[in-house]
């Protein structure tokens, strides 16, 4: 998935999923909070793959157990209605500090949900030519040429 879409929550904490993203998700999907306190949307298939990997992690490691609690405790299964609207639970909105305005960002196999101000601060970094030059070097080291 790719692309960036601005959305405004309605009075019931719902937004409309863009059609391109909706087509990729195919049915019910999951909203989770990541460690950066950004919300992530995954299809059933992608969520199952990630849940399986987390389940295979060493359950004797207290840090990994804590992560599993955090991740699964901050995940909900969601369905869109016929208009493509879906509810983002208040606890997840609060965790991500989303009040009204937000961005949906397609990031490969998931969609991130960012609060407006935080996304705009993040995006502004890419106007720094020194930062982008450093990033390009790192990408080349990883075998990614733009």
From Swiss-Prot:
Any coiled-coil regions, as ranges: none
Primary localisation category: cytoplasm
Origin: domain of life: Bacteria
Pfam family, one: MraZ
InterPro entries the UniProt entry points to: MraZ (IPR003444), MraZ_C (IPR035644), MraZ_dom (IPR020603), MraZ_N (IPR035642), MraZ_sf (IPR038619), SpoVT-AbrB_dom (IPR007159), SpoVT-AbrB_sf (IPR037914)
Keywords of the record: Cytoplasm, DNA-binding, Repeat, Transcription, Transcription regulation
GO biological process: negative regulation of DNA-templated transcription initiation
Subcellular location: Cytoplasm, Nucleoid
Span of domain SpoVT-AbrB: 4-46, 75-118
GO molecular function, one term: transcription cis-regulatory region binding
Record-level GO cellular component terms: cytoplasm; nucleoid
Subunit structure: Forms oligomers.
Protein family (similarity comment): Belongs to the MraZ family.
Name assigned to this protein: Transcriptional regulator MraZ
Species for this entry: Mesomycoplasma hyopneumoniae (strain 7448) (Mycoplasma hyopneumoniae)
Gene this chain is encoded by: mraZ
